[in-house]
A protein has these predicted regions:
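Soluble extramembrane regions of membrane proteins in the secretory/endomembrane system
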Residues: 1-176
Length: 176
């Protein structure tokens, strides 16, 4: 698309099936489903996808989803948010061809971390463990908890950058 503009986009709400399975396996209290709104994670998420080409899903109903079609073409991007607007995943596919040489600036993940709604002062730097889903030359990670009291959940935040620009950030609860 000219000037980096998206040619196609899609957005929708989807159920977080992995989260629902984890909650169902771990909490058998009778009021569980009524208390989900109070828990730090949501069983529902919003995704937004954009692409420099038409998004064509491979699934039977033809609906674009968070994972269909794959986010694998330069210029494609995806954002996943909670119903409250907190960032859970950011993904931006970098160019397929190298454009000049470094050195590249250190990536600044602070803006993305702020958008997660997590308490940044409670996150501790950690060694990255996850592979970035897109090409990257720098990675970072943090550990902490999300929520309070009995509902507190240990989390990891993993991030990656390409040539100084963030290309991936994911808030990863233990069931991921």
């Amino acid at each position: 698309a000219p000037d980096g503009m998206a040619m196609d986009e899609a957005y929708s709400f989807e159920w977080d099936v992995a989260y629902l399975a984890a909650v169902d396996a771990g909490d058998r209290s009778p009021d569980l489903w009524h208390r989900l709104a109070e828990k730090p994670f949501s069983p529902l998420y919003f995704f937004y996808r954009q692409s420099p080409r038409k998004l064509i899903a491979a699934n039977r109903d033809g609906m674009v989803r968070a994972d269909d079609p794959p986010v694998d073409m330069s210029g494609m991007a995806e954002v996943v948010l909670t119903p409250r607007g907190q960032l859970r995943t950011f993904l931006s596919v970098p160019p397929q061809r190298e454009t000049g040489g470094g050195p590249w600036p250190e990536p600044d993940f602070r803006a993305l971390l702020r958008e997660t709604g997590l308490d940044g002062s409670a996150l501790r730097p950690a060694a990255p463990q996850w592979a970035s889903p897109v090409d990257s030359d720098r990675k970072a990670a943090w550990e902490g908890t999300h929520g309070t009291g009995d509902d507190a959940v240990p989390i990891r935040v993993e991030a990656a950058a390409y040539h100084g620009r963030p290309v991936w950030l994911a808030v990863l609860p233990p069931w991921m």
